[in-house]
Regions:
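An N-terminal assembly and electron-transfer interface module characteristic of large anaerobic redox
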Residues: 11-504
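Hydrophobic alpha-helical targeting segments used for export or membrane insertion
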Residues: 3-11
Length: 504
């Protein structure tokens, strides 16, 4: 009863970075797994793609949540609070003074709830502005965003071998657009430095700044170095971190808050599918994958412990051999059979979608998928690992508080296989090929009639995979209801809202 009461009084007010399923739906579902309420603002306040969020209304909502005695933690996107979301953070718009004023409201929140836990997450601006088609009424439509991306990926300053290319790109971009881009980077850097100061003065308990989509070379390197120097000078080790990633940051901090509600520090072991797996480099992360993985363990509220773990994270890297796959699956099966918590992050999609699909099919057909506490395989190393760790931690916390919701857990895992495997490996290529056959090669923002047609095709195809996947994951359950869509009128992601029910 004490544990159940603790869960009830551990509600989390959660401000996501935008309204996409991976950053809004998944953190809320983590709460359901653990039996902890994760409350986001009304959907209308979060905006949609180029329709920016409403930070001032979200501040009012936060004050309302702060008045609730059961709200014990806050997990807040600084990009949403300062600018109106991730897309807004990459574009001119709110000036520094407006953004700074909004973030100062965090101090008001701290005054009202001095004992609440406040976690904040922000992004270090990626090198490319948001990709959008030519003619779109937003910052840097194609081809400008592509030229900016190429320019920002050069060394800073450009190497002698890059000088001519840099000059040509500057001419293609045009000085007004380049100035606006650089000013946006400067504004975001100044806001991130402010967040570090707010953490140093105790306003924020835990801060993470994620480097969004950028490799080891580019305009971001100088920003990273300055922020890392600030972090060190302010003595924030353990309270603030700078790491690769973006979309998983809110999910990881929600997992941290859930683990705190359970008074649990998860011990995490990491097992790579190849001996040198830790050194693999995701092309849009600035450091080897082990950097983000170790950082995410801490961000989720855990500690690395390869000897006596509560959860073992298995990481399947690209180019894993057939023999290594056999060893990997045997080890996961042995852990699961022993009642140990197993999370799988499959990174093979970084090289081959077909390899990823084949391994997902193997997990499902063997029954091993049903015995995992977490599965993830999407977009980047940090995205994948952060999601897998968070799901396993939510389940572990719920079990420790006696508030674990097995049906919510089944639903989360079902959606991950349906999205990460069926949509991205099977359905999305079909949608893109269909669009290309119709002469539509830019899929970053579809016209309304095209989006409606592709949504219908998405639903029809994905439903065909859904029943088969659920039959392998949970043969005693059926899909009671499911909504499928293309939430941002593009093929980059799908939305899946599923309700499972036991067979009668």
């Amino acid at each position: 009863l004490t544990h159940v009461l603790a869960a009830i009084l551990a509600a989390i007010a959660f401000v996501p970075i935008d309204d996409r399923p991976v950053v809004l739906q998944l953190p809320v579902m983590l709460g359901r797994i653990a039996g902890v309420t994760v409350e986001p603002p009304p959907r209308a306040l979060l905006g949609r793609f180029f329709e920016l969020g409403k930070p001032d209304a979200i501040i009012a909502w936060l004050n309302h949540e702060a008045a609730k005695p059961q709200t014990n933690a806050f997990v807040i996107s600084s990009d949403m609070l300062a600018y109106g979301g991730l897309t807004a953070s990459r574009a001119p718009g709110p000036n520094y003074a407006d953004a700074e004023s909004r973030l100062r409201e965090l101090a008001h929140l701290r005054t009202r709830r001095p004992h609440a836990w406040i976690g904040a997450f922000g992004t270090i601006m990626r090198l490319a502005p948001t990709g959008i088609p030519a003619g779109t009424d937003f910052f840097a439509p194609y081809p400008t965003w592509s030229y900016l991306q190429q320019y920002a990926n050069l060394h800073d300053p450009p190497l002698p071998s890059e000088t001519a290319r840099a000059q040509h790109l500057r001419e293609l971009i045009g000085q007004p657009a380049l100035d606006a881009y650089m000013a946006t980077r400067g504004r975001d850097l100044a806001i991130n430095r402010l967040l570090l100061k707010l953490t140093a003065n105790g306003t924020i308990d835990r801060l993470v700044l994620g480097q969004d989509d950028a490799g080891p070379v580019g305009l971001h390197v100088r920003d990273l170095q300055l922020l890392q120097a600030d972090l060190g000078a302010l003595g924030l080790a353990g309270r603030a971190s700078i790491e690769p990633g973006a979309d998983e940051l809110g999910t990881a901090l929600v997992a941290n808050a859930i683990a705190r509600a359970a008074h649990w520090i998860p011990r995490i072991a990491v097992r790579y599918s190849l001996p040198d797996g830790a050194s693999f480099q995701d092309p849009i992360e600035y450091a080897p994958i082990s950097t983000a993985i170790d950082a995410l363990i801490g961000l989720c509220g855990g500690v690395r412990d390869d000897e006596h773990p509560d959860i073992t994270l298995y990481v399947r890297v690209p180019t894993t051999t057939a023999a290594a796959d056999d060893t990997l699956t045997s080890a996961m099966a042995a852990d699961a059979a022993g009642g140990r918590s197993v999370a799988l992050a499959d990174l093979s999609y970084l090289r081959s979608d077909r390899d990823q699909a084949s391994f997902a099919q193997r997990l499902l057909a063997s029954g091993l998928a049903a015995r995992l506490d977490a599965y993830s395989s999407w977009n980047t190393n940090a995205n994948t690992v952060g999601t897998a760790l968070a799901e396993a931690i939510a389940a572990g916390a719920g079990r420790r508080m006696n508030t674990y919701n097995a049906l919510a857990h089944r639903t989360f895992t079902f959606i991950m296989f349906l999205d990460d495997y069926a949509y991205h490996d099977e359905v999305r290529p079909d949608l893109n090929a269909t669009l290309a056959a119709e002469g539509i090669t830019d899929h970053t923002l579809l016209a309304p009639d095209v989006a409606a047609s592709m949504t219908q095709r998405d639903r029809a195809l994905l439903w065909g995979y859904a029943d088969a996947i659920l039959a392998q994951l949970d043969p005693g359950y059926h899909i009671a209801a499911m909504l499928i869509g293309l939430p941002w009128s593009r093929t980059f992601e799908t939305s899946i809202d599923a309700a499972l029910a036991p067979n009668l």
